[in-house]
Design a protein with these regions (language model features):
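Conserved loop->alpha-helix
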Residues: 1-155
Length: 155
């Protein structure tokens, strides 16, 4: 659900029920979710299935805020702000997961990062429903974190 690994508890009359731990509530945007707000739903990847994008675990690191959205030609440039402690793991051209969508960081900025979104992705996800100031779930690429951690321990 919007990039967060959750287990469906019940599904009845198009109403889904999930249990959210305190950690999930703390790290994700779910505590700010509004009634009827559109979220992305992803089925879990089964062993042996093709990966289309990068490895998104559903382990959200932080909440990001959309600072700006610009439509340039047919694509969209999103500018995100994230907390300072998470910025150290942001690497240009690395993968990042926004609301469960595998994307590529096009530029690291002073307060966060930018991504480009193609029309197909924009149309099929909730990125088309959010605006400047909206909050998003951010999962930083696990490989970036592993490499950074490895080199920090070598020091």
């Amino acid at each position: 659900c919007d990039g967060v690994c959750l287990t469906l508890i019940t599904l009845k009359n198009k109403i889904m029920e999930f249990y959210l731990s305190n950690e999930t509530i703390k790290r994700s945007k779910f505590r700010f979710l509004k009634i009827n707000e559109q979220i992305n739903l992803e089925l879990p990847l089964k062993y042996g299935q093709k990966i289309s994008g990068h490895i998104c675990q559903g382990h959200v690191d932080t909440i990001g805020k959309i600072k700006d959205i610009k439509k340039i030609d047919k694509s969209y440039l999103f500018d995100f702000e994230i907390p300072l402690k998470e910025r150290k793991n942001i690497i240009e051209k690395a993968s990042i997961c926004i609301n469960g969508i595998s994307l590529t960081i096009s530029k690291v900025t002073k307060k966060g990062f930018q991504i480009w979104v193609i029309p197909h992705t924009f149309k099929l996800t909730n990125l088309s429903k959010i605006n400047k100031g909206s909050l998003v779930n951010v999962e930083i690429d696990i490989l970036s974190k592993y490499v950074k951690n490895f080199f920090n321990e070598k020091k």
